[in-house]
């Protein structure tokens, strides 16, 4: 990841990155962008980015909706509120939990200068790693929710939709990457999710805690991917999206 969206320096750095987009990627990256435009068609590549951003927006919106349902539906609201209250009583436990998302193991640049050195190809690889890392969690999420007594249709339908959107977004990013770097093999090295045992636990508190953490981490990563895509779109095309991107911390 460029930087975790929960990291303060990420929030401070990205607006500067967007404002200085015309000064960035002037060397190798600018050459690669012109190569893409000449050989593959700028319009088609932009269409792929537009499609990716739409899929990303839909995924983020559904994730927010689903998290809100978990807090409001009788199926899960009491458990989720208890988790929040327990966090308020034990800040150390809260920080440890919310900093243990499986994708947080990805390397990140620490400075603006390091971020400027990230190529278009490497940004796309980061997005692929994030999306790949969610394939198994989203599969098991949908499976386990169907086995949980009282899980409402509103949650089940959205779980399926998010999994489908994640797969479609991954396919779209791979199409973009194949045009940026033709013939490149897909990287299968991505962060592994290790909370399956907790999600399948017979102890309800443990199981719902796994659900809470999963949706917190999913919320962070859908936000991350969405902003990376808008950042790349701004870098490549300098269009209206540069002024439409907003940065804020997950509530």
Curated annotation (Swiss-Prot):
Gene3D superfamilies noted in UniProt: 1.20.1250.10
Disulphide-bonded residues: 101-217, 234-242
Keyword Secreted: yes
Signal sequence residues: 1-30
GO cellular component: extracellular region
Tissue-specific expression: Expressed exclusively in the placenta. Expressed in spongiotrophoblast cells and trophoblast giant cells of the junctional zone and in labyrinthine trophoblast.
Glycosylation sites: 57
GO-annotated molecular function: hormone activity
UniProt keyword list: Disulfide bond, Glycoprotein, Hormone, Secreted, Signal
Main location: secreted
A Pfam family the protein falls into: Hormone_1
Assigned protein family: Belongs to the somatotropin/prolactin family.
Name of protein: Prolactin-7C1
Organism per entry: Mus musculus
Phylogenetic placement of the source organism: Eukaryota, Metazoa, Chordata, Craniata, Vertebrata
């Amino acid at each position: 990841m460029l930087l975790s969206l929960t990291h303060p320096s990420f929030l401070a750095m990205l607006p500067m990155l967007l404002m200085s987009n015309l000064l960035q990627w002037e060397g190798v990256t600018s050459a690669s962008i012109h190569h893409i435009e000449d050989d593959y068609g700028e319009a088609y590549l932009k269409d792929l980015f537009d499609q990716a951003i739409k899929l990303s927006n839909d995924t983020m919106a559904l994730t927010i909706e689903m998290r809100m349902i978990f807090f409001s539906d009788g199926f899960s609201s009491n458990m989720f509120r208890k988790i929040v209250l327990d966090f308020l009583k034990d800040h150390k436990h809260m920080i440890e939990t919310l900093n243990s998302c499986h994708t947080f193991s990805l390397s990140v640049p620490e400075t603006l200068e390091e971020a400027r050195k990230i190529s278009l190809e490497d940004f796309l690889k980061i997005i692929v790693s994030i999306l790949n890392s969610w394939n198994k969690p989203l599969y098991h999420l949908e499976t386990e929710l169907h086995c949980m007594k009282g899980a409402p249709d509103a949650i089940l339908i959205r779980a399926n939709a998010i999994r489908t959107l994640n797969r479609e977004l991954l396919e779209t990013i791979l199409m973009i990457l194949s045009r940026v770097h033709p013939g490149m093999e897909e990287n299968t090295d991505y962060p592994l999710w290790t909370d399956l045992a907790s999600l399948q636990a017979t102890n309800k508190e443990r199981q719902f805690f796994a659900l809470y953490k999963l949706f917190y981490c999913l919320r962070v990563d859908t936000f991350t991917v969405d902003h990376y895509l808008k950042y790349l779109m701004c870098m490549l095309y300098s269009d209206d999206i540069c002024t439409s991107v907003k940065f804020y911390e997950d509530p």
